């Protein structure tokens, strides 16, 4: 079947017609891109809109984010959650906490967000020990630990809960036959695991840098 080629012009048309980016989101994205050399770590606006839509479609009220960076995806989630919704945001560093919290304050959603600075695996294990559950878990952190994050996330969502994983295509490097980079090997293993995992329903989407949705049965 014929396929639509997404040119830069068509991509920007999609952003213009299909994404409603809150002023606080736009300001945070532009600030991150202007000030940080690693701004490519941001999710794209359409990924943020997709995340927000998943939250609303599933009526999620609790959200766990593994990897915060400057809080752009966190802000998309916070704006989509109901007023009494809760977010736990995990990051190994507080380097960008000031930028993130400023944007969250601007959007009046900071009270929804608990920011935990520690290795994500430790934090996730602690949340499991506390008996906490989340309607949606978004994984966007150290790619070399994605297998561990996925298994821990499965313990943190109830039946019907959703795990959303970013960067599953890693700029096409997942196609390499013998990758030299450990994190590429990990992503390949993860993608193979999820494809055959009877515990979840799955969908991999080729936008942004690739997103996988896994719904726990």
Residue ranges of model-derived segments:
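A short alpha-helical cap/connector motif
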Residues: 1-136, 143-164, 168-217
């Amino acid at each position: 079947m014929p396929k639509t080629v997404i040119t830069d012009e068509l991509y920007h048309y999609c952003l213009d017609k299909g994404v409603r980016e809150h002023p606080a989101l736009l300001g945070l994205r532009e600030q991150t891109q202007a000030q940080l050399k690693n701004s490519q770590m941001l999710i794209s606006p359409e990924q943020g809109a997709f995340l927000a839509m998943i939250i609303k479609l599933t009526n999620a009220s609790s959200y766990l984010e593994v990897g915060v960076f400057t809080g752009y995806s966190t802000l998309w989630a916070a704006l989509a959650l109901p007023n009494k919704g809760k977010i736990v945001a995990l990051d190994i560093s507080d380097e960008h906490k000031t930028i993130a919290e400023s944007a969250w304050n601007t959007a009046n959603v900071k009270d929804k967000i608990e920011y935990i600075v520690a290795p994500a695996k430790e934090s996730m294990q602690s949340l499991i020990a506390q008996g906490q559950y989340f309607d949606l878990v978004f994984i966007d952190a150290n790619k070399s630990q994605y297998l561990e994050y996925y298994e821990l996330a499965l313990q943190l969502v109830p039946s019907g809960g959703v795990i959303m994983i970013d960067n599953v295509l890693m700029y096409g490097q997942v196609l390499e036959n013998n990758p030299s980079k450990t994190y590429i090997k990990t992503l390949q293993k993860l993608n193979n695991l999820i494809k055959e995992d009877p515990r979840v329903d799955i969908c991999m989407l080729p936008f942004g840098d690739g997103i996988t949705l896994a719904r726990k049965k």
